[in-house]
């Protein structure tokens, strides 16, 4: 394990390296420098002089000289923050670098530059963060089995010190977002995110996400491919990464921008993010806007039908090629357990409404270039698809009878989602998913 040091020794700067479109090696793009609580970015002249230079993200970081401050209300440009770890990665960093374990691991004590520089290099998107503008040193992990990664994740959750081998194995996944235990693995010509169960789970979250992702794909949505593995008697979800492309001389990286960054918000302001606002951004800034709007409407509907209320703005993203945005495949579709029937989405649906109902989807439909008839048909098709594929996907997941009963009608096709919907849709919600 890395020797422990004071958490107050925060770095003053970091250098941003970027994989340009179609390239397999990074180049330095610029520097982040701290100025009080805010962090400014400026492009390096060598990068500005490149004929193939692209803005990290425009309009937030336009390709120009001089220090660029973060947008109002932000301490760091959102497109840079998108590459930082979230709760799980920060727990691993606290364990690894500062020796803080279990309940002593206050992730709020970590500053952003520390998180960027102490997390793994194979982060989501096309950026990495280094201490040097001249020499790129990849922070990668040694090869580890899923069993070893699972063991390491459990130890971090329990606050148990890691051996150097387990510490290095888990380090690779520190740059991933989200709060749940996870790691990254390489599988020949694919890269995968491995998601593990948590000690605080009250139901099989891994299986519920697998079922939702498989049903989303069968419903015609563009969703990241997934598979379920059994390791050391526990379920592990493997999600194929869509921001990596294997070519003859290495890996290309695809830049990604979260919807939170599109909105110019941070986590404290995320409650203002909305599907309505994302639809407007798609109309003006995304490739194939009409088809993309229909896809997003489908994802909204499916999130409600499957009980995924964790559809916050970091769980939507677009590929960025330096000029245009293209919606990424759907990811992190994970049904949430609810105590009562009523539920609300993390993102507003239309106006100030966020209740998880099909009626709200229908009200929002015009923002997705769908009339009432087309929207209702789309919803009916999804309900039919869930019913038709339910048994098959439940068998793929090897769900127990108890799990089927919990997932069906508590998460998937919960009666609450049909309240206020047209009778034709309400009639489709009268039976169990099976």
Predicted regions mapped to residue ranges:
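Phosphate/dinucleotide-binding and metal-coordinating scaffold of catalytic cores
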Residues: 1-313, 317-434
């Amino acid at each position: 394990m890395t020797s422990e040091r004071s958490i107050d020794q925060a770095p003053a700067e970091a250098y941003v390296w970027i994989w340009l479109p179609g390239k397999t090696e990074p180049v330095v793009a610029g520097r982040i420098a701290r100025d009080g609580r805010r962090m400014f970015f400026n492009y390096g002249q060598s990068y500005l002089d490149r004929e193939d230079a692209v803005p990290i993200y425009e309009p937030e970081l336009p390709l120009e000289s001089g220090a660029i401050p973060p947008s109002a209300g932000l301490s760091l440009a959102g497109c840079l923050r998108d590459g930082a770890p979230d709760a799980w990665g920060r727990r691993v960093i606290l364990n690894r670098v500062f020796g803080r374990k279990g309940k002593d691991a206050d992730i709020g004590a970590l500053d952003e530059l520390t998180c960027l520089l102490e997390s793994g290099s194979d982060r989501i998107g096309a950026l990495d963060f280094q201490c040097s503008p001249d020499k790129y040193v990849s922070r990668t992990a040694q090869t580890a089995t899923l069993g070893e990664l699972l063991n390491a994740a459990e130890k971090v959750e329990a606050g148990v010190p890691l051996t150097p081998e387990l510490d290095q194995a888990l380090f690779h996944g520190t740059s991933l977002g989200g709060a749940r235990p996870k790691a990254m693995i390489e599988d020949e010509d694919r890269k995968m995110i491995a998601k593990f169960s948590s000690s605080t789970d009250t139901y099989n979250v891994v299986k519920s996400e697998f079922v939702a992702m498989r049903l989303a794909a069968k419903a015609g949505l563009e969703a990241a491919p997934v598979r379920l593995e059994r390791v050391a008697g526990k379920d592990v979800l493997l999600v194929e990464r869509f921001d990596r492309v294997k070519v003859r001389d290495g890996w290309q990286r695809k830049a990604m921008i979260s919807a939170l960054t599109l909105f110019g918000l941070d986590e404290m302001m995320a409650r203002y993010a909305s599907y309505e606002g994302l639809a407007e951004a798609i109309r003006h800034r995304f490739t194939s806007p009409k088809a993309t709007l229909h896809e997003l409407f489908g994802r909204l509907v499916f999130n409600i039908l499957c009980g995924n209320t964790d559809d916050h703005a970091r769980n939507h993203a677009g590929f960025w090629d330096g000029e245009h945005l293209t919606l990424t495949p759907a990811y992190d579709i994970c049904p949430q357990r609810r105590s009562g029937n009523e539920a609300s989405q993390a993102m507003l649906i239309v106006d100030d409404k966020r209740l998880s109902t099909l009626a709200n989807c229908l009200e929002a439909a015009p923002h997705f270039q769908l009339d009432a008839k087309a929207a209702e048909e789309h919803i009916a098709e999804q309900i039919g698809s869930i019913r038709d594929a339910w048994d098959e996907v439940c068998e793929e997941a090897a769900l127990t009878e108890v799990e089927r009963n919990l997932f069906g009608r508590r998460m998937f096709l919960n009666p609450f989602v049909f309240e206020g919907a047209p009778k034709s849709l309400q009639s489709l919600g009268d039976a169990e998913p099976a």
